[in-house]
Amino acid sequence: MINIPNSIRPFIRSANRTPCYLRSISSSSSSSFATPAEEHAGKQPSSAVPVKEFSIYRWNPDEPSKKPTLQTYSIDLKKCGPMVLDALIKIKNELDPTLTFRRSCREGICGSCAMNIDGVNTLACLKRINKETSAPVKIYPLPHMYIIKDLVPDMTHFYKQYKSIEPFLKNDNPPAQGEFLQSPEDRKKLDGMYECILCACCSTSCPSYWWNQDEYLGPAVLMQAYRWMADSRDSYGEDRKEKLQNTLSLYRCHTIFNCTKTCPKGLNPAKAISHIKREMASA
């Protein structure tokens, strides 16, 4: 779990590059084929909370003089889907159409709904609502990002960094006929990297990225850099390493491992970064 210290939590930057400080602020199922044990397991505990509060970060760029606040909404969980994104959609559709957030696939594939939920960077579509506690769900945008509105971070700089590593196959000697061939063993080397959906949960959980994101590429981009270095079809591995040979782009990683703990896809950016360091040290 990524706990954001009180001294850091209020410091979420707005899209105009000015720091913004937070003010204190039913589905039915058939049981005809179920065993008694299965039926008992499927019953909701009596302690389950039927109504849940969601405290959500709000900031409107059209009202620049108004400080960001936490706004609380109450949701009947019996009339809401199981995920935090379901609650956000319900709030927007039924309670407050001004609430702004990104979402698309609802299946953990696009990365659009990345946000900080109860102190952890994750995807709202994959985060289940905790029904066993009456504590409100606290939802913030990804930390230390410029905010466009409410839960929508400005991803411009993140994508610019991603573009800088040239995330595509580079080879000056294409095959005379057909496609590039790759052995199963070489293909397996890409597992755990190509699945990255660029949600930025890992990068925005990294203290080194918080303080050096103008120069340090961050876990997500560095893992993607290694994805292309490790690809047997790419012939620009040395060139890619050379571009990282400076004091900031790569070496600001201090192996804190927040990136690995928070990745909603279960990937290991820290491992990829360590591979880059090892290869560059042995070159």
Swiss-Prot record:
A molecular function GO annotation: 3 iron, 4 sulfur cluster binding
Disulfide bonds: none
CDD domains for this protein: fer2
Binding site for a ubiquinone: 211
Catalytic activity: a quinone + succinate = fumarate + a quinol
Key words, A-Z: 2Fe-2S, 3Fe-4S, 4Fe-4S, Electron transport, Iron, Iron-sulfur, Membrane, Metal-binding, Mitochondrion, Mitochondrion inner membrane, Oxidoreductase, Transit peptide, Transport, Tricarboxylic acid cycle
Purpose: Iron-sulfur protein (IP) subunit of succinate dehydrogenase (SDH) that is involved in complex II of the mitochondrial electron transport chain and is responsible for transferring electrons from succinate to ubiquinone (coenzyme Q).
Pathway listed: Carbohydrate metabolism; tricarboxylic acid cycle; fumarate from succinate (eukaryal route): step 1/1
Sites where the protein binds [2Fe-2S] cluster: 105, 110, 113, 125
Cofactor(s) listed: [2Fe-2S] cluster; [3Fe-4S] cluster; [4Fe-4S] cluster
Domain 4Fe-4S ferredoxin-type, chain residue ranges per copy: 186-216
Name listed for the protein in its UniProt record: Succinate dehydrogenase [ubiquinone] iron-sulfur subunit, mitochondrial
PANTHER family: SUCCINATE DEHYDROGENASE [UBIQUINONE] IRON-SULFUR SUBUNIT, MITOCHONDRIAL (PTHR11921:SF29), SUCCINATE DEHYDROGENASE IRON-SULFUR PROTEIN (PTHR11921)
GO biological process: respiratory electron transport chain; tricarboxylic acid cycle
Subunit structure: Component of complex II composed of four subunits: a flavoprotein (FP), an iron-sulfur protein (IP), and a cytochrome b composed of a large and a small subunit.
Residues the entry annotates as binding [3Fe-4S] cluster: 206, 253, 259
Co-factor: note: Binds 1 [2Fe-2S] cluster. Binds 1 [3Fe-4S] cluster.
Binding-site residues for [4Fe-4S] cluster, renumbered to this chain: 196, 199, 202, 263
Subcellular compartments: Mitochondrion inner membrane
Family (UniProt): Belongs to the succinate dehydrogenase/fumarate reductase iron-sulfur protein family.
Top enzyme class: oxidoreductase
Membrane topology listed for this record: Peripheral membrane protein
EC number from the UniProt entry: 1.3.5.1
GO cellular component: mitochondrial inner membrane
Major location category of this protein: mitochondrion
Organism: Uromyces fabae
